[in-house]
């Protein structure tokens, strides 16, 4: 070895030795000590340093005193320390992202220096040795991927001599897979032979200061501007969870945080810091991939309590710091973490200790003896009902990972039931077993289900006096709710207010009152029916609750909460939370709608996707949400050019609330998977006379996944003739006979991407003028089992790439308004003409002979959004996707085990989707970037178009106020 090192000595050039040190941010003192030991071991193991050529001690001293520091503007918290000496170039990466580390590793391998050292020291998993980075992880698998890059191999092959690379990494796990590589002399974890020196100690002390964990207030920073975010529509934020997952599900009146991700700098913080309360926290599995982000939030809440009890400072500064949301019920099973960091603390034990300090008792999640009996998380008359079905674990296994299904049943008959699955690390076989126990539920047997579809049997069998009132068409009564919960909800004064309005006003006025909560005042349009509703006083979607009571020991709220209180920690299945006192001020009842309501279409077969920047109108209407990024504003004006004088944007301004600090979600921009695609042709889809039908420049890419996805927003129902707002002759045709009837299994029906005018029921094919001539505003549709399919989940986000989907039956672009006779492209050949007629006949049939069809074993279950089981929970084959049919699949968890089986999961999705009997549009949302996924996308892109599969990129952003954060918002 001495002869090899002496060869380049006469021609030794500056920086012939290259040192790359990678350190991850440490969250506890024990972890910091472990990382410093690994750093020292790595530097002292570099035997290639010839003391006659390079004095490592002097070079490290020079680094400490002369290095330059660079803070990344893209990856918050990442720092680069660099120094280039006469013989040694040193680069230290602190708290990097996975992409930054891969880029620097590529540069290290391609550098012509003959001797190189790579020290990988940071928090790592005990099982695999995978390093835990700010985003994702880094393992031996990722190292081999970078080493196998063609550009790297070409650089190594062109070198005059094979360079020597010493790698100091974890000595356990899968790092032993690193072996000899062509064109590279690789040495893995050699023993530490160099003596300790003063320069090395100074280097370690300086790095230790940079790796010390920040305070909770520095880790989770307060926003630049205060205010509360109101989420009126059902939605789900998909956050990049690093090695795990993190999601935030919200409905009108209740919010649920699911897991926290592996990054201590919580990915969900920039959203929840604008909330006054998180009503429920659901931890599907305890480990280093799901709890660090949640524990950071708990530490901040504890620090806020200590700061509030400490010396008083400036009032405004204290209010700005003490802003974390109040926490409701917490569901947590395991008492010990399933995965731990080497040298770190047990995240599950830490979470329970923090919850105990905050006075919160975590509740276990277990499947009951009757899995179809859910836990009612939230229920409010006139708003809806949120149910929690626990699919796993079974009774007697509390430490197993939990699998939860959330079902939101809104009160409005025409609104869509939302079904979201969070499996965590549940094995697929047990997940399917849990779903099989629920497949008899009507809400899981169709791709799209409305509340009207579920209330018919209850209304037929109900002996309550409410069955004879007109309000039963709008306020469904669930038979599974106990008498106590029903009477408790009934005691709310808001119900009497709504009933008085409904009983004293005529039919058309009643329609106006019911629809104002979705349309809102100030709708800018030229349609007479909307302007007729303009001067009317807005009626809210739901009465707000009084300030939410805190859990014992919880920090006091700074502002009044307008959300209903979280359920008591003693929730039991089929038990609703206690009622709350409604507010008396009608202004406080407004819920600040967050997105515009697209105007209804003129033809019953035309569907128009949500336009461009769906939440920007609410942003413009919010009194304290005017700091919009200039580039985003310019993009908005470019995508929506000025139209004719008679056309105006159907954009709804948000109603001003009594609170002076309401924050509205403004811009969402999920990027499409970035690959070369042919430019899409202009869609011949028709539209109404509003400015949504303005023709856009073909070179402008869509900025909303709602446009790129051929799905319909909940605000764009398929126009049909019947309506629950008619008080005249249509009431008889509208109401089914009062006999028990359960809908049969869903037959082949038109896909989620289109509406076949020939397949609609006869009443739905009536001209719009005939059906709605007596009404000033068209009521939301009440679709049948055949026409309900187009009401799909809308990913309300903006995409940066082109649509690129030629076979999609509905495009994001619209034709000019002077083409009212055009209808969207459909996939008629794939839809049997008899299926819609059968579905329509089934809906109109009545009598004792109507019985549900028997369910075959392994019948499919339809969901709106489903996370895929992660963390190496098990192999997902095509049978899984054949039985679990979701409109949106989320792949999360950038771990080594996840990447190893990723290609098989993606291929299984294609194979399973190919066997679906319904033509549904499916969206795949990955939370991380992967070379495996890129290759799969390039090789199978043509199949995506044929099967109706869209893949989003992992760089989605949500812009709120004056900053953006990585997330993808899915609206239902």
Curated annotation (Swiss-Prot):
InterPro entries for the chain: MAP1 (IPR026074), MAP1B/S_N (IPR056617), RibonucZ/Hydroxyglut_hydro (IPR036866)
Keywords on record: Apoptosis, Cytoplasm, Cytoskeleton, DNA-binding, Microtubule, Nucleus, Phosphoprotein
Phosphoprotein is among the record's keywords: yes
Ranges of Low complexity composition bias in the record: 602-620, 702-721, 781-800
Region of interest: Necessary for interaction with RASSF1: 600-972
Family matches, as PANTHER family: MICROTUBULE-ASSOCIATED PROTEIN, MICROTUBULE-ASSOCIATED PROTEIN 1S
Family membership: Belongs to the MAP1A/MAP1B/MAP1S family.
Domain comment in the entry: The N-terminus of the heavy chain associates with the C-terminus of the light chain to form the heterodimer complex. Its C-terminal part of the heavy chain interacts with ESR1.
Function: Microtubule-associated protein that mediates aggregation of mitochondria resulting in cell death and genomic destruction (MAGD). Plays a role in anchoring the microtubule organizing center to the centrosomes. Binds to DNA. Plays a role in apoptosis. Involved in the formation of microtubule bundles.
Name of the protein this chain belongs to: Microtubule-associated protein 1S
Gene responsible for this protein: Map1s
């Amino acid at each position: 070895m001495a002869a090899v090192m002496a060869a380049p000595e006469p021609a030794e050039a500056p920086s012939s030795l290259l040192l790359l040190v990678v350190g991850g941010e440490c969250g506890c003192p024990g972890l910091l000590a472990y990382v410093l030991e690994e750093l020292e071991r790595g530097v002292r193991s570099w035997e290639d340093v010839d003391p006659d050529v390079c004095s490592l001690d002097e070079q490290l001293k020079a680094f400490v005193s002369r290095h330059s520091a660079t803070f990344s503007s893209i990856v918050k918290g990442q720092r680069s320390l660099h120094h280039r000496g006469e013989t040694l170039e040193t680069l230290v990466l602190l708290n990097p992202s996975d992409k930054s580390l891969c880029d620097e590793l590529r540069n290290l391998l391609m550098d012509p220096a003959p001797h190189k050292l790579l020290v990988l020291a940071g928090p790592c998993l005990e099982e695999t040795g995978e390093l835990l980075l700010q985003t994702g992880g880094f393992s031996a698998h990722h190292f081999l991927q970078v080493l196998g890059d063609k550009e790297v191999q070409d650089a190594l092959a062109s070198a005059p001599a094979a360079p020597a690379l010493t790698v100091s990494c974890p000595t356990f796990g899968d790092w032993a897979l690193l072996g000899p590589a062509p064109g590279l002399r690789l040495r893995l974890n050699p023993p530490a032979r160099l003596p300790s020196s003063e320069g090395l100690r100074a280097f370690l002390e300086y790095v230790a200061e940079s790796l010390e964990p920040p305070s909770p207030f520095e880790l989770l920073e307060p926003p630049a501007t205060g205010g509360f975010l109101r989420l009126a529509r059902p939605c789900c934020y998909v956050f990049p969870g690093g090695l795990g997952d993190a999601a935030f599900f919200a409905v009108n009146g209740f919010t649920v945080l699911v897991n926290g991700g592996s990054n201590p700098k919580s990915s969900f913080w920039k959203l929840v810091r604008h909330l006054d309360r998180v009503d429920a926290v659901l931890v599907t599995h305890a480990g280093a991939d799901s709890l660090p982000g949640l524990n950071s939030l708990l530490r901040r809440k504890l620090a806020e309590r200590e700061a509030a009890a400490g010396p008083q400072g400036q009032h405004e500064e204290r209010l700005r710091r003490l802003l974390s949301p109040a926490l409701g019920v917490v569901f947590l099973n395991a008492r010990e973490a399933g995965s731990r960091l080497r040298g770190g603390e047990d995240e599950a034990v830490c979470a329970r200790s923090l919850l105990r300090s905050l006075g919160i008792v975590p509740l276990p999640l277990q499947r009951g003896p009757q899995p179809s009996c859910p836990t009612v998380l939230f229920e409010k008359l006139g708003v809806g009902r949120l149910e929690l079905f626990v699919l796993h674990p079974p009774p007697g296994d509390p430490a197993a990972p939990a699998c939860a299904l959330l079902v939101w049943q809104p009160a409005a008959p025409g609104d869509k039931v939302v079904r979201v699955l969070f499996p965590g690390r549940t094995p697929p076989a047990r997940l399917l077993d849990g779903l099989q126990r629920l497949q008899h539920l009507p809400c899981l047997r169709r791709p799209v289900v409305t509340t009207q579809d579920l209330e018919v049997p209850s209304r037929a069998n109900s002996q309550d006096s409410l069955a004879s009132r007109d309000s039963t068409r709008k306020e469904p009564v669930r038979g599974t709710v106990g008498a106590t919960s029903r009477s408790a909800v009934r005691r709310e004064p808001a119900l009497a207010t709504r009933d008085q309005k409904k009983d004293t006003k005529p039919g058309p006025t009643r329609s106006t009152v019911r629809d104002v909560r979705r349309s809102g005042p100030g709708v800018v349009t030229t349609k007479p029916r909307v302007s007729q509703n303009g001067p009317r006083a807005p009626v809210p979607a739901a009465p707000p609750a009084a300030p939410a009571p805190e859990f014992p020991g919880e920090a006091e709220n700074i502002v009044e909460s307008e959300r209903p209180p979280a359920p008591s920690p003693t929730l039991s299945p089929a038990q609703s939370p206690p009622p709350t006192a409604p507010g008396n001020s009608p202004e406080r009842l407004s819920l600040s709608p967050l997105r515009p309501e697209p105007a209804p279409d003129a033809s019953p077969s035309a569907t128009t996707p949500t336009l461009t920047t769906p939440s920007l109108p609410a942003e413009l209407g919010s009194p304290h949400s005017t700091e919009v990024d200039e580039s985003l504003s310019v993009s908005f004006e470019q995508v929506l050019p000025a139209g004719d004088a008679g056309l105006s944007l159907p954009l709804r301004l948000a109603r001003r609330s009594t609170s002076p600090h309401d924050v509205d979600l403004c811009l969402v921009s999920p990027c499409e998977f970035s690959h070369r695609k042919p430019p899409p042709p202009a869609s011949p889809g028709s539209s109404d006379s509003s400015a949504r039908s303005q023709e856009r420049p073909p070179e402008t890419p869509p900025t909303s996944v709602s446009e790129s996805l051929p799905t319909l927003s909940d605000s764009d129902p398929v126009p049909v003739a019947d309506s629950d707002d008619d008080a005249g002759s249509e009431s008889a045709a509208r109401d089914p006979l009062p006999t028990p009837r359960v809908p049969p299994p869903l037959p082949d029906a038109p896909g989620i991407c289109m509406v076949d005018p020939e397949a609609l029921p006869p009443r739905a094919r009536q001209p719009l003028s005939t059906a709605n001539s007596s009404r000033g505003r068209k009521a939301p549709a009440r679709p049948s089992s055949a026409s309900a399919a187009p009401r799909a989940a809308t990913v309300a986000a903006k995409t940066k790439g082109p649509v690129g989907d030629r076979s999609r039956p509905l495009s994001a672009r619209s034709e000019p308004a002077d083409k009212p006779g055009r209808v969207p492209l459909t996939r008629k050949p794939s839809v049997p003409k008899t299926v819609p007629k059968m579905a329509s006949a089934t809906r109109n049939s009545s009598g004792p002979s109507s019985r549900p069809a028997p369910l075959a074993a392994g019948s499919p279950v339809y969901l709106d959004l489903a996370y895929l089981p992660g963390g190496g929970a098990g192999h997902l084959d095509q049978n899984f996707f054949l039985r679990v049919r979701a409109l949106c699949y989320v792949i999360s968890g950038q771990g080594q085990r996840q990447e190893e089986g990723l290609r098989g999961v993606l291929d299984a999705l294609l194979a399973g989707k190919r066997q679906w009997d319904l033509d549904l549009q499916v969206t795949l949302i990955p939370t991380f970037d992967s070379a495996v996924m890129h290759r799969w996308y390039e090789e199978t892109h043509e199949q995506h178009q044929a099967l109706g599969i869209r893949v989003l990129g992992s760089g989605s952003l949500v812009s709120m106020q004056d900053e953006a954060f990585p997330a993808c918002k899915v609206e239902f």
